[in-house]
Amino acid sequence: MSRRKGFTLIELLIVVAIIAVLVSVLLPALRAARENATLAVCLGNLKVLSSNWLWYAEDNKGKIVGGHTWPTVGTPETKDNPYHWVLRPTTNIGPSIPEQEEAIERGKLWSYVKNMEAYHCPSDRERVASNGAILYGWGSYSIVGTLNGEGWPGCCANKKIRKLSAIKYPETKYVFVEEADWRGWNMGSWGVHVRECPSMSDYFGDRLAAWHVDKCDFGWADGHASVRKWQKDRTVDFINGEYADYNVVAFTAPDTDNADLRFLQQGFPYIP
């Protein structure tokens, strides 16, 4: 009876080389497919949050929900100290996931969006604190400060929008952004420097999250959501921390010709 010959060394090396080539070709495609899937989930989250933010206002005589993260969990709600869309966790720096979830459940928007997954981008895996510690956040999104939030320094510091009717062309104004606060949870509200503030009109402001590398999702005041692919490498560098310290807001060099910054400024809702 004849014996079957096994693979020669050269044949085995050829097979290994072919497998290596296939892996090198397929891995980027698999990574891209996974990223597209998480981007779509995140976009769906912002669609849910934005549409329910809108419904909250419609159910409350046009008054929009508070865009701050206030007060701290356990603080009684009063007329002068109303609850906002989410509250503040009991631990300020690096709160546990259960603490963050409780802060979400105590917020005003929870009765409209009782799905904890809707508050979390699947690409939001970890955050690096200013001391290098790894923190884990749950709430991946923030409301802009001018929408009944904590305001924003400069020209629109005390010009908060409290009624839905004050938002002109809501389909052009965003409400929710992706943010990655260095404290492990998104404290307060988010803001960008508007063009009406001459001394700061070429500066970004608060950083956005870099969950999707060169893209970010936005939730808009008419209830829709969209993806923005950043056009400038400098924008991606800023979002990834090249020009901003984790403890400093707006610590970045001016950028006089940046279409991404103009996009953020044009979509930022405020009263001039």
For each predicted feature, which ranges?
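Short, well-structured segments within or immediately adjacent to enzyme catalytic domains
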Residues: 40-272
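Generic N-terminal leader/processing signal
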Residues: 1-3, 29, 45, 193
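Juxtamembrane interface helices immediately C-terminal to a transmembrane segment
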Residues: 25, 34-45
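N-terminal single-pass transmembrane signal-anchor helix
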Residues: 3-34
